[in-house]
């Protein structure tokens, strides 16, 4: 298949969100589907209180190398497609911090699309439009709109899946 666009999610694909919650906020991050709303609220409050949280995240293990390999093959087709917390969380600088992180750590030239999670699917333009994301829900929605999803589990698995898609 001809790949027309590759969208990278940021949190837990390129940037180590859980490590950031642990090291920068000093709390154990809840699962992506927390049993307790209070636990989830506590995490978002800690992130809100941590100055420039998203700009201070480290790479996921192997993510920088994975990104560089894909970007070197598709420099004009790679973009970041990352969600920000819902407005009621009060983390107003999240989008600017994510853009700063991308500019500093990846490339000053790569387009950065800042959206709410549920808006990601609006970027699908056809089957050659690939999303690399760690959330199954995002992949399901992306594929339901006609795109191709790669559920992120590791850099190696992502590169393998991308090679399969390329044919």
Where in this protein do the model-derived segments appear?
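Active-site neighborhood of HAD-like aspartate-dependent phosphohydrolases
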Residues: 1-48, 144, 154
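Substrate-recognition element of Asp-dependent hydrolases with the DxDx(T/V) motif
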Residues: 57-58, 63-95, 102
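Structural recognition of alpha->loop->beta junctions
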Residues: 98-113
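Conserved Lys-Pro-Asp/Glu-containing loop-to-beta segment of HAD-superfamily phosphomonoesterases
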Residues: 113-140
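Acidic, Mg2+-coordinating phosphoryl-transfer loop and its flanking beta/alpha structural elements
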Residues: 130-162
């Amino acid at each position: 298949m001809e790949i027309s666009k590759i969208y990278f999610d940021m949190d837990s694909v390129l940037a180590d969100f859980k490590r950031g919650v642990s090291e920068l906020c000093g709390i154990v991050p809840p699962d992506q589907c927390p049993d307790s709303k209070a636990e989830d609220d506590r995490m978002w409050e800690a992130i809100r209180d941590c100055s420039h949280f998203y700009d201070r995240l480290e790479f996921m293990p192997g993510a920088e190398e994975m990104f560089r390999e894909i970007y070197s093959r598709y420099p004009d087709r790679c973009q970041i497609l990352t969600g920000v917390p819902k407005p009621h969380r009060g983390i107003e600088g999240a989008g600017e911090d994510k853009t700063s992180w991308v500019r500093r750590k990846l490339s000053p030239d790569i387009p950065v699309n800042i959206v709410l999670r549920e808006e990601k699917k609006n970027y699908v333009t056809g089957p050659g439009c690939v999303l690399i994301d760690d959330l199954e829900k995002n992949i399901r929605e992306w594929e339901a709109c006609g795109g191709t999803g790669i559920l992120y589990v590791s850099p190696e698995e992502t590169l393998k899946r991308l090679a399969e898609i390329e044919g």
